[in-house]
Amino acid sequence: MAETAASRTGSVARKTNETSISVSVNLDGTGKSKISTGVGFFDHMLDQLSRHSLIDMEIEAKGDLHIDDHHTVEDTGIAIGQAISKALGDRRGITRYASIDLAMDETMTKAAVDLSGRPFLVWNVAFSAPKIGTFDTELVREFFQALAQNAGITLHLLNHYGANNHHIAETCFKAVARALRTATEIDPRQAGRVPSTKGTLV
């Protein structure tokens, strides 16, 4: 088991004309994070993602924030997704599936994940305002689209109800975190097998 845990890490360095991003993850962590993207609300959400998934994350992003937050948020999602995919390897022994209905005050959001290697996002979340502070609410979807695409995750997000846009965004991140926490765990009954009748998830 110790050998498996030691191997479940992934690092990515991604540099474009718009952003420079480095990400390291440990799937068998305790939810420790060191995050700096230059976007305060986004840092707060990524801290929730790490803390509630128990995936250790180190994220440093420098982007063209003088234009807007879009490239930084999307490219960070790409890099986190790629790092998680590396950490999962051939995905042997993982639980694979998980879902949760997560409550926060007046808000309830459902996340369901399948670490299938087949990226797909179903997004049923609506915000009542274009911004949370200075953060564009449309970027929440952009982040999860990038994450799912690059981690090889089928991800469904459904906001059942909620009035506070901060709470809606935060429950999306926390629900995905809790689902990832379960889905990435090693199932001892799998005995190192790939959890698919096809014999592969990549």
From Swiss-Prot:
GO terms for biological process: L-histidine biosynthetic process. It comes from the Bacteria. GO terms for cellular component: cytoplasm. It is an enzyme of class 4 (lyase). This is Imidazoleglycerol-phosphate dehydratase. Belongs to the imidazoleglycerol-phosphate dehydratase family. It holds the Pfam family IGPD. GO terms for molecular function: imidazoleglycerol-phosphate dehydratase activity. Keywords: Amino-acid biosynthesis, Cytoplasm, Histidine biosynthesis, Lyase. It is found in: Cytoplasm. The lineage of its organism: Bacteria, Pseudomonadati, Pseudomonadota, Alphaproteobacteria, Hyphomicrobiales. It comes from Rhizobium etli (strain ATCC 51251 / DSM 11541 / JCM 21823 / NBRC 15573 / CFN 42). Pathway: Amino-acid biosynthesis; L-histidine biosynthesis; L-histidine from 5-phospho-alpha-D-ribose 1-diphosphate: step 6/9.
